[in-house]
């Protein structure tokens, strides 16, 4: 039997290992031989145990499943009487295994694609918007009113892009981790003392992307609890926090 030099923690799970073995056999997923892939898989697990490497229980469960599928194919079906027809709906099938492998492969390819897109996007920098009010007609009305979740998310996304760009230029990043409750209290105290503040002015002070995420979640929770409200100011994307004065007022942010 072929010796394996790949460590089991290289794979993210039994399906990942199965895809690796199928790839080595150079066959399509739908054309797999259950008996052959079972022998390959069990041989791999036994090699790991031979070298006293820890084998996660999920790998052993998959090995048992493959052996059950192999035995069903090799052994003749057991005849049963009509009145005692068992329910095999929960038993594993070759078709079910193939479906899981196809779905997992599609998931892996999607993850790789999204990571490539993220790396590509981080190499780009969007220049901050300029003040174009001097070029606008006086007849254009300025919007000053409630915001919905999409508006907040758009402004938040712009802050994330800027923060990631700055972090990539730093050799070391000091992370100051805060819980959601701590950030809600901090944001509430800030709004209570200043009565209102600029969205960008407040968020730009966050030390890293992780803190930005927690701060944005804290903002959404305070809006949901009707402690603060948000408004669009003129033609800018800025958002102000205003402490809600009446709990019975109509919600100003749609979550």
Swiss-Prot record:
A single Gene Ontology CC term: cytoplasm
GO terms (BP aspect): cell division; chromosome segregation; DNA replication
Entry keyword annotation includes Cytoplasm: yes
Pfam families linked: SMC_ScpA
Alphabetical keyword list: Cell cycle, Cell division, Chromosome partition, Cytoplasm
Recorded superkingdom: Bacteria
Keyword Glycoprotein: no
Record-annotated disulphide pairs: none
Localisation: Cytoplasm
Function description: Participates in chromosomal partition during cell division. May act via the formation of a condensin-like complex containing Smc and ScpB that pull DNA away from mid-cell into both cell halves.
Record-linked HAMAP family: ScpA
Entry's family note: Belongs to the ScpA family.
Description of how the protein assembles with itself and partners: Component of a cohesin-like complex composed of ScpA, ScpB and the Smc homodimer, in which ScpA and ScpB bind to the head domain of Smc. The presence of the three proteins is required for the association of the complex with DNA.
Protein name: Segregation and condensation protein A
